[in-house]
Structures are given as structure tokens and as C-alpha cells.
């Protein structure tokens, strides 16, 4: 029976691997190297439509990207305040658990900040990720108007020669290696995106499309890895978290939709691309969705990368500052009492 689920090649493996780990009471192990190979392929597919005109359009939209980032992160901060008020989890953990950054990035940051509950942060980010990964593809595929860009359906008609395929494969792999060397976030995907886009612009050549079965296989490999990283046995440890976090996720999604509509009206890009650009998902999940629905991957990557870099480079200092001020205020109130 066909369930007509959004992103079946990604979400199916996530669900079955996570549930399988729950049934067998221990997590599955999935090769990081296999996941990285899949991400290189997906990153190449996202970078190949890039052109010089696309780059100029993205640069002109940078103020909008930064504004969208600040609004989305602020909405996540408001969700953290609600979580703190309605649960027994400390404010530091709520802040790190509710901000729409990547699961791994927020967990690493939580491990570096005193008083952060690593388990609580992991569970909150996992629940947020699961909500976003299921809801956003559904909205984009079944609710929003179709995107105007060519999607993966064209892939079979744009196969390149063996020499072209080998050349661009080498470009994508070298991009991933270089990105890892200089410690870029999500290097196996971001590296090929940037290297492929740069090569296309510099050489003024058309990159061969990736056949649909290859993209589907890559989605399965990435989905299986995400599913193996989810530990559903820990969800019962924090009673009352789910409802507040779900409400917070819906709030951030509404904010993202409003931002997407505004950006679509201001820039003329299609609504699917604008929504995926502002949605609080990870670069991997939103990138796969963009490929499936035929959205403008280059614009989506630019917006998502702006937020990702802000969260990784700037937000840690903001989070530490907020936590410091909160502790100072709490200490002052305790002293008065």
C-alpha cells in the first residue's frame, strides 16, 4: 500500500531504524563513511544548478537572510522561555534545546556550557528535529504551490559523458575533503555544494544531473543514519516536555511560513523555495526536500547556511551571555531573599 508520505526515501528509513532500535533495546550502528558518501552525492546535486546570476541574486538578498536568521533564532529563544516556565528543566538547557540549530551542534555546545543538561538538550533537539523533518516536507509537497525550478524528474534526461561524470565527481569529493580540512559545518554536503557551484561558474559548463535512483539511494543512506542516532528510549525521562516543545515547533514553523511569504513577495522567488529557506530544519533535510520538490537549491542553501553559520559562530557567545545574565539575576534575587 502506498502511503504517499513526504520524502519516503528519507523518512521511511528514519522511522524504521529508530523503531527497530527501540524494539531491540539497543541502537543500530550505521557507518559514518557511508552517510558521508551519500551526502557528497546530494551536495553535488544541490550545487549543480548554481550560476553567476544566482550568485548575484543571493548576494543582493543577504540583508534578508540575516533578518530571517535573527527572527527565527528569536522565536526559538521565546520557545525556550516557555519551556523553562512550564517544566523543571533549567533555563540553560531549554535555550540550547529549543534554538533551531543542528542536533549535533547544539549537543556539542551543551557539553561545553556549565549547568546544561546534555540528556535534556539531546531529547529536545531530537523531538524538534523529528517534528520538523516530518511536517516541513508534508507542507512543501502537499500544501504549497509547486516550485518553478526543475527538479530531479529531469535528471534522467541530462546525463553527461563518462569524462564529465568523473570530472565533477572529483570536484565534489575534493570539495568535501577541503571543507572537512577547514572545519566547515556539515562538510560532506556543504563542500560539494560550494566546489560544484564554483566549478560550474568558473568553467561555464553544465554539470551532469544525478539519476533519480541514485538520489533515492542517497536519501535511504542518510535516513538510516539519522534513525540510528535517535534514542527513543529516553523520551519518557522528561514528562511534560513534549507538549510545550511541539507548541514551540509550531510557533517557529508559523514564523518561518510568514517569513517565507514575505521573502517570496519581496524577491519574486517561489513560495516553496522561500519556505524551505526560512524553515527551522537542518541543511541536509531541507536540501533533500528542495531536490524532491524542484525548489531553488542554491537560494535555499544560502539562507540555511547563513543561519547555520550564525548559530555555530555567533550564537554560542550569545547563549553564554544570556546564561550569564540569567545566573546573575537569579543570584541577585537569592541574595535579596
Where does each model-flagged region fall?
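Alpha-helical membrane segments and immediately flanking helix-loop junctions
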Residues: 86-127, 269-303
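Intrinsically disordered, low-complexity non-transmembrane regions of multi-pass membrane transporters
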Residues: 95, 105, 117-120, 145-162, ...
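Transmembrane alpha-helix boundary signature
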Residues: 26-28, 47-61, 77-92, 261-266
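Membrane-embedded alpha-helical segments of transport systems
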Residues: 71-72, 100-106, 122-144, 255, ...
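Long hydrophobic alpha-helical segments that form multi-pass transmembrane helix bundles
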Residues: 129-169
Amino acid at each position: 500500500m502506498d502511503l504517499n508520505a513526504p520524502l519516503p526515501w528519507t523518512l521511511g528509513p528514519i522511522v524504521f531504524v529508530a523503531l527497530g532500535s527501540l524494539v531491540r533495546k539497543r541502537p543500530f550502528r550505521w557507518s559514518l563513511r557511508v552517510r558521508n558518501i551519500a551526502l557528497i552525492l546530494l551536495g553535488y546535486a544541490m550545487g549543480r544548478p548554481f550560476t553567476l546570476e544566482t550568485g548575484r541574486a543571493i548576494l543582493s538578498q543577504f540583508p534578508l537572510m540575516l533578518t530571517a536568521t535573527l527572527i527565527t533564532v528569536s522565536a526559538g529563544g521565546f520557545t525556550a522561555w516557555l519551556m523553562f516556565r512550564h517544566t523543571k528543566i533549567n533555563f540553560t538547557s531549554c535555550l540550547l534545546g529549543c534554538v533551531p540549530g543542528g542536533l549535533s551542534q547544539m549537543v556539542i555546545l551543551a557539553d561545553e556550557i556549565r549547568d546544561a543538561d546534555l540528556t535534556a538538550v539531546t531529547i529536545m533537539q531530537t523531538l524538534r528535529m523529528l517534528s520538523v523533518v516530518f511536517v516541513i516536507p508534508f507542507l512543501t509537497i502537499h500544501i504549497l504551490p509547486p516550485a518553478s525550478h526543475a527538479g530531479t524528474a529531469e535528471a534522467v534526461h541530462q546525463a553527461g559523458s563518462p569524462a564529465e561524470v568523473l570530472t565533477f565527481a572529483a570536484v565534489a569529493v575534493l570539495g568535501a575533503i577541503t571543507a572537512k580540512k577547514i572545519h566547515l559545518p556539515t562538510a560532506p554536503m556543504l563542500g560539494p555544494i560550494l566546489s560544484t557551484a564554483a566549478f560550474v561558474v568558473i568553467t561555464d559548463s553544465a554539470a551532469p544531473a544525478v539519476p533519480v535512483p541514485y538520489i533515492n539511494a542517497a536519501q535511504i543512506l542518510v535516513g538510516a543514519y539519522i534513525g540510528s542516532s535517535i534514542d527513543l528510549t529516553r523520551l519518557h525521562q522528561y514528562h511534560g516536555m513534549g507538549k510545550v516543545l511541539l507548541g514551540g515547533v509550531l510557533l517557529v514553523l508559523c514564523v518561518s511560513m510568514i517569513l517565507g511569504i514575505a521573502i517570496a513577495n519581496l524577491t519574486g522567488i517561489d513560495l516553496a523555495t522561500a519556505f524551505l529557506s526560512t524553515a527551522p530544519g537542518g541543511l541536509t533535510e531541507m536540501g533533500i526536500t528542495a531536490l524532491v520538490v524542484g525548489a531553488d537549491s542554491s537560494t535555499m542553501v544560502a539562507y540555511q547556511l547563513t543561519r547555520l553559520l550564525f548559530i555555530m559562530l555567533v550564537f554560542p557567545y550569545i547563549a553564554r551571555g544570556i546564561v550569564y545574565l540569567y545566573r546573575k539575576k537569579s543570584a541577585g534575587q537569592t541574595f535579596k531573599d
